[in-house]
């Protein structure tokens, strides 16, 4: 994935992922599990339900150390079965 993020960010820096997925109890745990593999830390994600309650938005902020970490997390979060979109 070619991005210009590397030109825009100065590492280390805070970086927030917003993950939209199906409203299942395990969604948040799966997101945190993936993030922990690449950026270990103590996370308290912010979860917001959609207006109809079918989807949840999970926001989680990491301290990114390099562009490869950012891109790998985008890819792995997007590959989760319950996830529909990662911003």
Curated annotation (Swiss-Prot):
Transmembrane segments: none annotated. It comes from the Bacteria. Pfam families: DUF493 (PF04359). GO terms for cellular component: cytosol. HAMAP family: UPF0250. Belongs to the UPF0250 family. This is UPF0250 protein YE3006.
């Amino acid at each position: 994935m070619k991005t210009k993020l590397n030109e825009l960010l100065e590492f280390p820096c805070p970086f927030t992922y917003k993950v939209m997925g199906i409203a299942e109890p395990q969604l948040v745990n799966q997101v945190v599990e993936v993030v922990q593999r690449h950026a270990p830390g103590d996370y308290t994600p912010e979860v917001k339900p959609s207006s109809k309650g079918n989807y949840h938005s999970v926001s989680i902020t990491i301290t990114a150390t390099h562009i490869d970490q950012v891109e790998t997390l985008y890819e792995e979060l997007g590959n989760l079965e319950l996830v529909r979109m990662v911003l």
